């Protein structure tokens, strides 16, 4: 198999400046809604990139849980590698690959922790099994076998068979305050359309970038 021979044309249509919303959050919500309507698998899945203390980058797929004018929100174990890295360096990058629509969105910004009240509101809305899993898994730690994790889950399931499950102190969310948001639309002959929104003291500048 020759990887260099794997290619296709992008035919979904171009993106013009006049098509864009003035606010990139509004534009993002429009594209996200269209991704959902297109029946895409996991349209809220995004790559979250962070760096460790030595500048080594790490990436993982995380689900976006909310977005508004204040930023993009996701939740995680606060002892996880990404949370620890954000504690040392709050700079972060998000990437949404909406391949069926021939679109990408790339976001850079700064991550800040959510308030305990915000964490509690979302935690209590989760399915019971998801709440238990958040307690059972010490994310990114080494375990001897999957059975250890499953055993802990069953133990907690029996313990909290009745009543509410307490939110663990080591679980919570981050809000990514965007500094830049780039919208990418595939184009014919590799002449893709790219528009970069840059936050300048609360106002958004828009630039077209070469593909």
Swiss-Prot record:
FMN binds at residues 60-65, 75-76, 81-82, 104, 139-140, 184, 194. InterPro entries: Pyridox_Oxase, Pyridox_Oxase_CS, Pyridox_Oxase_N, Pyridoxamine_oxidase_dimer_C, Split_barrel_FMN-bd. Signal peptide: none annotated. Binds 1 FMN per subunit. Keywords: Flavoprotein, FMN, Oxidoreductase, Pyridoxine biosynthesis. Its EC number is 1.4.3.5. Pathway: Cofactor metabolism; pyridoxal 5'-phosphate salvage; pyridoxal 5'-phosphate from pyridoxamine 5'-phosphate: step 1/1; Cofactor metabolism; pyridoxal 5'-phosphate salvage; pyridoxal 5'-phosphate from pyridoxine 5'-phosphate: step 1/1. One of its GO terms (molecular function) is pyridoxamine phosphate oxidase activity. Pfam families: PNP_phzG_C, PNPOx_N. The keyword Phosphoprotein does not apply. Gene3D superfamilies: Electron Transport, Fmn-binding Protein, Chain A. Its cofactor is FMN. Substrate binds at residues 7-10, 65, 122, 126, 130, 190-192. It catalyses: pyridoxamine 5'-phosphate + O2 + H2O = pyridoxal 5'-phosphate + H2O2 + NH4(+); pyridoxine 5'-phosphate + O2 = pyridoxal 5'-phosphate + H2O2. PROSITE patterns: PYRIDOX_OXIDASE. It comes from the Bacteria. The keyword Lyase does not apply. HAMAP family: PdxH. Catalyzes the oxidation of either pyridoxine 5'-phosphate (PNP) or pyridoxamine 5'-phosphate (PMP) into pyridoxal 5'-phosphate (PLP). Belongs to the pyridoxamine 5'-phosphate oxidase family. Homodimer. This is Pyridoxine/pyridoxamine 5'-phosphate oxidase. It comes from Vibrio campbellii (strain ATCC BAA-1116).
